[in-house]
Protein backbone atom coordinates (compact mmCIF):
# COMPACT_ATOMS: atom_id res chain seq x y z
CA UNK A 1 0.00 0.00 0.00
CA UNK A 2 2.85 2.37 0.74
CA UNK A 3 4.32 1.83 -2.70
CA UNK A 4 1.15 3.25 -4.25
CA UNK A 5 1.51 6.55 -2.40
CA UNK A 6 5.23 6.85 -3.12
CA UNK A 7 4.87 6.05 -6.79
CA UNK A 8 5.94 9.03 -8.88
CA UNK A 9 4.13 7.66 -11.94
CA UNK A 10 0.78 7.74 -10.14
CA UNK A 11 1.53 11.28 -9.00
CA UNK A 12 2.35 12.30 -12.57
CA UNK A 13 -0.88 10.75 -13.87
CA UNK A 14 -2.86 12.57 -11.16
CA UNK A 15 -1.27 15.91 -12.08
CA UNK A 16 -1.95 15.37 -15.78
CA UNK A 17 -5.57 14.50 -15.02
CA UNK A 18 -6.12 17.56 -12.85
CA UNK A 19 -4.38 19.94 -15.25
CA UNK A 20 -6.21 18.61 -18.30
CA UNK A 21 -9.53 18.91 -16.49
CA UNK A 22 -8.71 22.48 -15.44
CA UNK A 23 -7.35 23.63 -18.81
CA UNK A 24 -9.35 21.57 -21.32
CA UNK A 25 -12.53 19.87 -20.12
CA UNK A 26 -14.22 22.47 -17.92
CA UNK A 27 -13.44 25.48 -20.20
CA UNK A 28 -14.94 23.65 -23.19
CA UNK A 29 -18.05 22.86 -21.15
CA UNK A 30 -18.25 26.53 -20.12
CA UNK A 31 -18.00 27.68 -23.75
CA UNK A 32 -20.75 25.25 -24.73
CA UNK A 33 -22.99 26.35 -21.84
CA UNK A 34 -22.49 30.07 -22.52
CA UNK A 35 -23.04 29.67 -26.25
CA UNK A 36 -26.36 27.86 -25.77
CA UNK A 37 -27.82 29.89 -22.91
CA UNK A 38 -26.40 33.40 -23.33
CA UNK A 39 -29.69 35.15 -24.17
CA UNK A 40 -31.93 33.21 -21.78
CA UNK A 41 -29.80 33.12 -18.60
CA UNK A 42 -31.21 34.42 -15.37
CA UNK A 43 -29.26 36.81 -13.20
CA UNK A 44 -28.08 34.19 -10.70
CA UNK A 45 -27.05 31.78 -13.44
CA UNK A 46 -25.12 34.58 -15.15
CA UNK A 47 -23.44 35.47 -11.86
CA UNK A 48 -22.40 31.84 -11.41
CA UNK A 49 -21.08 31.64 -14.96
CA UNK A 50 -19.07 34.83 -14.45
CA UNK A 51 -17.56 33.27 -11.33
CA UNK A 52 -16.64 30.12 -13.27
CA UNK A 53 -15.14 32.23 -16.07
CA UNK A 54 -12.97 33.97 -13.47
CA UNK A 55 -11.97 30.61 -11.98
CA UNK A 56 -11.18 28.87 -15.29
CA UNK A 57 -9.78 31.89 -17.14
CA UNK A 58 -6.46 30.27 -18.23
CA UNK A 59 -8.28 27.44 -20.00
CA UNK A 60 -10.72 29.85 -21.65
CA UNK A 61 -7.80 31.91 -22.95
CA UNK A 62 -6.36 28.77 -24.58
CA UNK A 63 -9.55 28.24 -26.61
CA UNK A 64 -10.46 31.87 -27.29
CA UNK A 65 -8.65 32.09 -30.68
CA UNK A 66 -10.67 29.13 -31.96
CA UNK A 67 -14.13 29.70 -30.45
CA UNK A 68 -16.30 32.78 -30.23
CA UNK A 69 -19.61 33.77 -28.70
CA UNK A 70 -20.83 36.06 -31.47
CA UNK A 71 -24.52 36.15 -32.13
CA UNK A 72 -25.59 34.34 -35.27
CA UNK A 73 -27.70 37.19 -36.64
CA UNK A 74 -30.75 37.05 -38.85
CA UNK A 75 -28.94 36.53 -42.14
CA UNK A 76 -30.21 39.81 -43.62
CA UNK A 77 -27.94 42.48 -44.94
UniProtKB/Swiss-Prot annotation:
GO terms for molecular function: oxidoreductase activity, acting on NAD(P)H, quinone or similar compound as acceptor; quinone binding. It is a multi-pass membrane protein. It comes from the Bacteria. GO terms for cellular component: plasma membrane-derived thylakoid membrane. The keyword Isomerase does not apply. It catalyses: a plastoquinone + NADH + (n+1) H(+)(in) = a plastoquinol + NAD(+) + n H(+)(out); a plastoquinone + NADPH + (n+1) H(+)(in) = a plastoquinol + NADP(+) + n H(+)(out). Keywords: Membrane, NAD, NADP, Plastoquinone, Quinone, Thylakoid, Translocase, Transmembrane, Transmembrane helix, Transport. It holds the Pfam family NdhL. Coiled coil: none annotated. It is found in: Cellular thylakoid membrane. Disulfide bonds: none annotated. The chain crosses the membrane at residues 12-32, 47-67. Its EC number is 7.1.1.-. It is an enzyme of class 7 (translocase). NDH-1 shuttles electrons from an unknown electron donor, via FMN and iron-sulfur (Fe-S) centers, to quinones in the respiratory and/or the photosynthetic chain. The immediate electron acceptor for the enzyme in this species is believed to be plastoquinone. Couples the redox reaction to proton translocation, and thus conserves the redox energy in a proton gradient. Cyanobacterial NDH-1 also plays a role in inorganic carbon-concentration. Belongs to the complex I NdhL subunit family. HAMAP family: NDH1_NDH1L. NDH-1 can be composed of about 15 different subunits; different subcomplexes with different compositions have been identified which probably have different functions. This is NAD(P)H-quinone oxidoreductase subunit L. The gene is ndhL.
Amino acid sequence: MESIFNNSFATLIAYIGIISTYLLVIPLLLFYWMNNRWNIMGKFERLGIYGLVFLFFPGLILFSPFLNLRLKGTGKG
